[in-house]
């Protein structure tokens, strides 16, 4: 099996919501978030339906009683919704639905939303095909942290970032610090950049792409403490 695992974006909240025996992580009807895959970059999609598209429940919703979901029924429709133009990270599909997670890059705090959306309400956003160096350089913000990209030595870019995630009694932190050269539309590096990304060595694995005005960052949840991930869309602040 390829290296793939669910990020800490939303799964922890699910496990705290009810008895562990009621939750089946392998139930294909459960939307658990997005996965890291060594072989495949994260895909961003945009909501094209509207003006509102409501999330659809998983069986673990409503205190694990939404057993008939996901389905296109009033009982399976969540109160929360997205609007036309919102960008989401996508996970698996189940029938006519796609599992998505959403975090506004403009928010001041980390509030991830997740659930099923009708696949017909989404369209893929293609990454910038050949970003220039100037397209990467800058300070990029995401709720909870930021990443700085600057010119480095030997045609590489120097990348530094920090992330803070609130916990029950304290907070957890993560750090990125490496040098990497863009290849086509992607920056990919492991730990400090000294390990080739193609190898399965190292702990902190990171990929970056330019998607619209945003910097898409994804990691394997190995770049910090428990529940810490840099995964998300970042906006350039300077």
Regions found by a protein language model. Name each.
Residues 129-147, 230-238:
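Tryptophan-anchored aromatic micro-motifs
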Residues 216-229:
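Short, exposed beta-strand-loop hairpins at the edges of beta-sheets
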């Amino acid at each position: 099996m390829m290296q793939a695992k669910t990020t800490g974006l939303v799964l922890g909240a699910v496990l705290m919501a009810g008895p562990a025996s009621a939750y089946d992580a392998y139930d294909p009807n459960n939307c658990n978030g997005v996965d890291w895959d060594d072989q495949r970059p994260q895909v961003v999609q945009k909501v094209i339906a509207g003006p509102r598209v409501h999330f659809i429940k998983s069986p673990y919703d409503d205190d694990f009683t939404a057993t008939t979901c996901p389905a296109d029924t009033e009982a399976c429709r969540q109160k929360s919704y997205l609007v036309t133009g919102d960008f989401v990270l996508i996970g698996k599909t189940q029938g006519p639905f796609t599992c998505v997670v959403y975090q506004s890059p403009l928010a001041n705090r980390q509030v991830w939303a997740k659930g099923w959306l009708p696949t017909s309400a989404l369209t893929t956003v293609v990454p910038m095909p050949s970003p220039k160096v100037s397209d990467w350089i800058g300070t990029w913000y995401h709720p909870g942290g930021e990443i700085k990209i600057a010119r480095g030595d030997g045609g590489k870019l120097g990348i530094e970032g920090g992330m803070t995630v609130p916990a029950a009694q304290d907070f957890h932190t993560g750090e990125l610090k490496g040098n990497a050269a863009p290849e086509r539309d992607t920056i990919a590096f492991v730990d400090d950049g000294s390990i080739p990304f193609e190898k399965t060595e190292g702990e902190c694995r990171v990929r970056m792409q330019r998607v619209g005005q945003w910097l898409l960052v994804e990691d394997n949840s190995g770049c910090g403490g428990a529940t810490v991930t840099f995964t998300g869309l970042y906006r350039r602040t300077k």
